[in-house]
Protein backbone atom coordinates (compact mmCIF):
# COMPACT_ATOMS: atom_id res chain seq x y z
CA UNK A 1 0.00 0.00 0.00
CA UNK A 2 1.09 3.56 -0.62
CA UNK A 3 0.00 6.81 1.04
CA UNK A 4 0.68 10.42 0.13
CA UNK A 5 0.86 13.29 2.59
CA UNK A 6 0.76 17.04 2.06
CA UNK A 7 2.31 19.07 4.88
CA UNK A 8 1.35 22.71 4.35
CA UNK A 9 1.70 24.05 7.89
CA UNK A 10 4.96 24.53 9.71
CA UNK A 11 3.79 23.68 13.19
CA UNK A 12 4.89 20.91 15.51
CA UNK A 13 1.58 19.02 15.54
CA UNK A 14 1.42 18.47 11.78
CA UNK A 15 5.10 17.52 11.66
CA UNK A 16 4.76 14.94 14.42
CA UNK A 17 1.52 13.57 12.96
CA UNK A 18 3.19 12.97 9.60
CA UNK A 19 6.29 11.45 11.22
CA UNK A 20 4.37 9.12 13.53
CA UNK A 21 1.96 7.99 10.81
CA UNK A 22 4.73 7.30 8.30
CA UNK A 23 6.91 5.63 10.92
CA UNK A 24 4.06 3.32 11.86
CA UNK A 25 3.18 2.78 8.22
CA UNK A 26 6.74 1.85 7.26
CA UNK A 27 6.70 -0.84 9.97
CA UNK A 28 3.54 -2.17 8.28
CA UNK A 29 5.20 -2.13 4.83
CA UNK A 30 3.35 1.03 3.73
CA UNK A 31 5.21 3.41 1.43
CA UNK A 32 4.73 7.16 1.70
CA UNK A 33 5.54 10.32 -0.20
CA UNK A 34 5.40 13.51 1.88
CA UNK A 35 5.09 16.82 -0.02
CA UNK A 36 6.12 19.88 2.01
CA UNK A 37 4.61 23.09 0.70
CA UNK A 38 3.88 26.62 1.94
CA UNK A 39 4.92 26.97 5.62
CA UNK A 40 5.42 23.21 5.84
CA UNK A 41 8.56 23.71 3.73
CA UNK A 42 10.21 25.37 6.76
CA UNK A 43 10.23 21.94 8.41
CA UNK A 44 12.64 20.66 5.75
CA UNK A 45 15.10 23.50 6.23
CA UNK A 46 18.22 22.65 8.23
CA UNK A 47 17.23 23.00 11.90
CA UNK A 48 13.60 23.68 10.95
CA UNK A 49 12.02 20.51 12.31
CA UNK A 50 13.57 20.99 15.74
CA UNK A 51 12.45 24.64 15.84
CA UNK A 52 8.80 23.86 15.07
CA UNK A 53 6.34 25.04 17.71
CA UNK A 54 2.82 23.99 18.60
CA UNK A 55 0.08 26.07 17.04
CA UNK A 56 -2.20 26.73 20.01
CA UNK A 57 -2.58 28.49 22.35
CA UNK A 58 -0.48 31.38 20.98
CA UNK A 59 0.26 32.85 24.40
CA UNK A 60 1.80 29.55 25.56
CA UNK A 61 3.40 28.53 22.26
CA UNK A 62 7.03 28.43 23.47
CA UNK A 63 6.35 26.92 26.88
CA UNK A 64 3.74 24.52 25.50
CA UNK A 65 6.17 23.29 22.84
CA UNK A 66 8.87 22.69 25.44
CA UNK A 67 6.46 20.72 27.65
CA UNK A 68 5.15 18.70 24.70
CA UNK A 69 8.68 17.83 23.52
CA UNK A 70 9.67 16.75 27.05
CA UNK A 71 6.63 14.47 27.26
CA UNK A 72 7.45 12.92 23.89
CA UNK A 73 11.05 12.39 24.99
CA UNK A 74 9.83 10.78 28.22
CA UNK A 75 7.85 8.18 26.28
CA UNK A 76 10.76 7.41 23.96
CA UNK A 77 10.48 9.78 21.01
CA UNK A 78 13.58 11.50 19.66
CA UNK A 79 14.02 15.00 18.28
CA UNK A 80 11.97 15.60 15.12
CA UNK A 81 15.11 15.89 12.97
CA UNK A 82 16.28 12.45 14.13
CA UNK A 83 12.86 10.97 13.50
CA UNK A 84 12.83 12.38 9.96
CA UNK A 85 16.19 10.71 9.33
CA UNK A 86 14.89 7.40 10.65
CA UNK A 87 11.72 7.36 8.54
CA UNK A 88 13.75 8.06 5.39
CA UNK A 89 16.26 5.34 6.35
CA UNK A 90 13.43 2.78 6.22
CA UNK A 91 13.49 3.17 2.45
CA UNK A 92 9.70 3.43 2.44
CA UNK A 93 9.30 7.17 3.04
CA UNK A 94 10.32 9.97 0.70
CA UNK A 95 10.37 13.70 1.51
CA UNK A 96 9.64 16.17 -1.29
CA UNK A 97 10.04 19.96 -1.31
CA UNK A 98 7.69 22.15 -3.37
CA UNK A 99 9.39 24.00 -6.23
CA UNK A 100 6.97 26.94 -6.22
CA UNK A 101 7.17 27.43 -2.47
CA UNK A 102 10.97 27.36 -2.62
CA UNK A 103 10.88 30.14 -5.21
CA UNK A 104 8.30 32.18 -3.27
CA UNK A 105 10.22 31.89 0.00
CA UNK A 106 13.68 32.19 -1.57
CA UNK A 107 14.77 28.79 -0.24
CA UNK A 108 17.77 27.17 -1.92
CA UNK A 109 18.45 23.44 -2.22
CA UNK A 110 21.45 23.79 0.11
CA UNK A 111 19.09 25.17 2.81
CA UNK A 112 17.30 21.81 2.97
CA UNK A 113 18.16 18.75 5.04
CA UNK A 114 19.96 15.92 3.28
CA UNK A 115 16.99 13.57 3.66
CA UNK A 116 14.96 15.45 1.02
CA UNK A 117 14.51 13.12 -1.96
CA UNK A 118 13.97 15.95 -4.40
CA UNK A 119 12.32 19.21 -5.34
CA UNK A 120 9.11 18.81 -7.32
CA UNK A 121 6.14 20.84 -8.46
CA UNK A 122 2.50 20.20 -7.73
CA UNK A 123 1.91 18.34 -11.01
CA UNK A 124 4.77 15.92 -10.32
CA UNK A 125 3.54 15.29 -6.79
CA UNK A 126 0.00 14.67 -8.05
CA UNK A 127 1.40 12.10 -10.48
CA UNK A 128 3.16 10.40 -7.54
CA UNK A 129 0.00 10.54 -5.45
CA UNK A 130 -2.18 9.11 -8.24
CA UNK A 131 -1.42 5.54 -7.19
CA UNK A 132 -1.66 6.24 -3.45
CA UNK A 133 -4.54 4.60 -1.62
CA UNK A 134 -5.14 7.82 0.35
CA UNK A 135 -3.87 11.39 0.29
CA UNK A 136 -3.68 12.98 3.74
CA UNK A 137 -3.44 16.75 4.16
CA UNK A 138 -1.76 17.97 7.32
Positions of the model-derived regions?
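A charged, amphipathic interaction segment
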Residues: 77-123, 127-133
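A glycine-rich helix N-cap at a beta->alpha junction
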Residues: 53-82
Amino acid sequence: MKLAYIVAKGNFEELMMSIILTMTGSAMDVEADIFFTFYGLNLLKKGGADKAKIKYPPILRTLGTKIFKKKLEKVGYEKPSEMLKKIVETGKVRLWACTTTMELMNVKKEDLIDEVEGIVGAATFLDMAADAKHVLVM
